[in-house]
Amino acid sequence: YSQIKGQPRTEEGNFWHKQIYPNQVWLDGIYMAQPFYALYEKHFGDGDFSDTVGQIQTVRAKMFSKDKGLYFHGYDASRSAFWADPETGCSRNFWLRSLGWFAVALADLTEILPDGAGRDKLVPIFTELMASVGRYADPDTGLYWQVPDQGGRADNYLETSGSAMMAYAMLKGARLGLLEKGYAAKGQKTFHGIVEKYLSVTETGLNLGGICLVAGLGPENNRRRDGSYEYYISEPVVENDAKGVAPFVLAYTEVKRLRS
């Protein structure tokens, strides 16, 4: 909590992603900070969630593409990063796992925040994203593409971690009554699609494949991470990385709740 309170902020009031990424907001970082921040305020603070709500609203205002219904991976408030659009400050593409982190953060925050504490401002942002992202799912498997809006490209691939996050968010949203019941079926389809495509049993036990190892934007001395389509599909695809296994387990907990 002391780290959060001392974290540098952009001119709009959002936390920097990291010290080495000054003035930058990444979708990944919303999940890293905001659910914990809100839980701390709920149990140990004064119950003021306005900071969390305000930061989410800024992400919606600055990083949302109305044309695609998706959020760009990063935003540089200073417009000085080599990957940032000089007018909008946003990176140029959408990355599935960053969208997944944001979706999971929203799903969790809508459960954490009580009524009358800004929850009503987050719910429309969550439902809007779930409605728009669903149209990018692969119709056969229910999975989502590494670069979600470019699924027709031969070198793009169906990615596990972000797909599991979307499954979790849709299942949880339906359970909480924020989404129509049909979203539970969509979430189940995605989860079972992951099982069929990427979960295997070997001599060492269960193995989960199709996981993008890592992706980011910069810093200045790493210009390969430029937010291009070619960059996102160039990162290693691995098995059993925690960033894929953990969301898969989270999605499974929601599948189990649905069955109970």
Positions of predicted regions on the chain:
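Long, well-ordered core segments of solenoidal/helical folds
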Residues: 1-14, 50-83, 123-141, 186-203
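Extracytoplasmic mature domains of secreted/periplasmic and thylakoid-lumen proteins
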Residues: 1-32, 43
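Surface-exposed helix-capping loop/turn segments at secondary-structure junctions
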Residues: 11, 65-69, 112-119, 138-144, ...
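Charged catalytic carboxylate motif
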Residues: 32, 51, 101, 125-128, ...
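CBM-like carbohydrate-recognition segments
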Residues: 3, 13, 157-158, 162, ...
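Solvent-exposed loop and edge beta-strand segments that line ligand/cofactor-binding
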Residues: 17-30, 83-104, 115-122, 138, ...
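His/Met- and acidic-residue-enriched segments that coordinate or traffic transition-metal cofactors
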Residues: 30-34, 53, 58-63, 67-91, ...
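Well-ordered alpha-helical scaffold segments within catalytic/enzyme domains
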Residues: 34-46, 101-118, 164-179, 247-259
